[in-house]
Amino acid sequence: MEFFKDLKSDPIGKVASLQDERAIWIIMVVAMSGLVIVAHSLFQNYVYMAPCEQCVYIRFSMLVMALGGVIAAINPKNIILKIIGYVLGFYGAIIGMMYCIKLNSIHHAVHSEDPFGVQGCSAEPSFPFGLPLDMWAPDWFKPTGDCGYDNPIVPDDVSLSWLQQWFVDFYSEGWYLIPSLKFMNMAQACFIAYAVAFILLFAMFICWILKLKRA
């Protein structure tokens, strides 16, 4: 109750004060790294959904945001560390949305049988700054699937548990937020996650700047 009372009386000051605490930055770290871990450990390794080129780029951008949160959380009151956190956070969110838009267009082309729309999907990724992440951590960053096709492909020699079989059947038509309705594919869901993160970061950043001007 005290939080909402302070937010109502001085919204700019309250939002600005949040970023001086580690909690908000740790939330960003947990959220973004958590999504990557779920994508890798659950969907890739457990349900056998092979990641495509754009998928591993999305993982990269999420980890960039997580890194920004880690750096800012070291000392949130340190201006330099906070600026680095913001730069990495905004950068990760922006390129992440761009990757999502690209993946969504490929997904649409694949499922509409438009051969001219299926472009931008390679087995040899090119990460920003020339980082050879696919060589450093191939299980995490080497694309082994085709863009737009994210349905499970179970190896012939694998025996599935009943829970694995349930997941495989559940996502047999590909990853959707609501598979039975084919509602919101993975690219669209990730875009929303990035957009929400960007809006929150932007609001925090503006409130911080306004607070500095008050001082």
UniProtKB/Swiss-Prot annotation:
Subcellular location: Cell inner membrane
UniProt-recorded Gene Ontology molecular function terms: protein-disulfide reductase activity
Disulfide bond positions: 52-55, 121-147
One GO CC term on file: plasma membrane
Membrane topology annotation: Multi-pass membrane protein
Main location: membrane
Regions that span the bilayer: 23-43, 56-75, 79-99, 190-210
Superkingdom, natural source: Bacteria
Disulfide bond recorded as keyword: yes
Annotated keywords: Cell inner membrane, Cell membrane, Disulfide bond, Electron transport, Membrane, Oxidoreductase, Redox-active center, Transmembrane, Transmembrane helix, Transport
GO biological process, one term: protein folding
InterPro entries, alphabetized: DiS_bond_form_DsbB/BdbC, DsbB, DsbB-like_sf
Gene3D superfamilies: DsbB-like
Similarity-based family: Belongs to the DsbB family. DsbI subfamily.
Subunit structure and binding partners: Interacts with DsbL.
PANTHER family referenced in this protein's UniProt entry, alphabetically: DISULFIDE BOND FORMATION PROTEIN B (PTHR36570), PROTEIN-DISULFIDE OXIDOREDUCTASE DSBI (PTHR36570:SF1)
Function as written in the Swiss-Prot or TrEMBL entry: Required for disulfide bond formation in some proteins. Part of a redox system composed of DsbI and DsbL that mediates formation of an essential disulfide bond in AssT.
UniProt protein name: Putative protein-disulfide oxidoreductase DsbI
Organism: Campylobacter fetus subsp. fetus (strain 82-40)
